[in-house]
Amino acid sequence: KLLDDLGVEAVIDRKAAGYRFWADEHTQDEGEWRRLGKDVRAFVGDDPDIVFEHPGRSTMGASVFICKRGGTVVTCAATAGYMVEFDNRHFWMKLKRLVGSHFANYAESWQANRLIQLGRIQPLLSAVHPLAATGEAARTIHRNEHEGKIGVLCLAPQEGLGVDDPELRQRIGEDRITLFRRHGG
């Protein structure tokens, strides 16, 4: 229900599908990459132009493989290991690009904030904690027990005190702003 409310059209759950991109700790399984590619194409009709890669070692080979010829793999982390490995033939022979990203620079951050102020995008919080509970909030993130974003109130005793455009907030709607919380995030 949460994903439907966010407008997600298709989801492939790696765990539920049982993908094993590594046959053992030294050998990747190209057959599993092909299976993932087939599943992606079944949902969207083509190979993806852009693949957002987060886990790192466990999935980089598959991400490079399924990315469309001339497409881009964007990596923004490496939670499953920083030492990635992939078959370079699937990279250079198909003219793919690899882009590293760590969110944004100052100008991009300013533009993202501007889009928030215009109501074009809405940051979705699953939980907000008082400053005294920062340790618990960090522990929740460290254990990956959260969905979406978590906020910490630094200079405010309660939520809502930083709202400087109530009309925009009303236009966006509390139901959209609190979407993750309503779904038990």
Listing of model-derived features with the role each one plays in the protein:
Residues 35, 46, 61, 106-185:
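C-terminal hydrophobic helical "lid"/dimerization subdomain
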Residues 78-95, 106-112:
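Rossmann-fold NAD(P)-binding glycine/threonine-rich loop
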Residues 71-72, 96:
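Glycine-centered, small-residue-biased loops immediately flanking beta-strands
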Residues 14-20, 77-81, 103-104:
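Short, acidic/turn-prone active-site loops that include or flank metal/cofactor-
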Residues 1-58:
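Adenosine-nucleotide cofactor-binding segment
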Residues 67-68:
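Helix-to-beta-strand junctions that scaffold the AdoMet/dcAdoMet cofactor pocket
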Residues 48-52, 71, 149:
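Short SAM/SAH-binding signature in class I
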Residues 3, 51, 63, 98, ...:
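Terminal peptide-recognition signature
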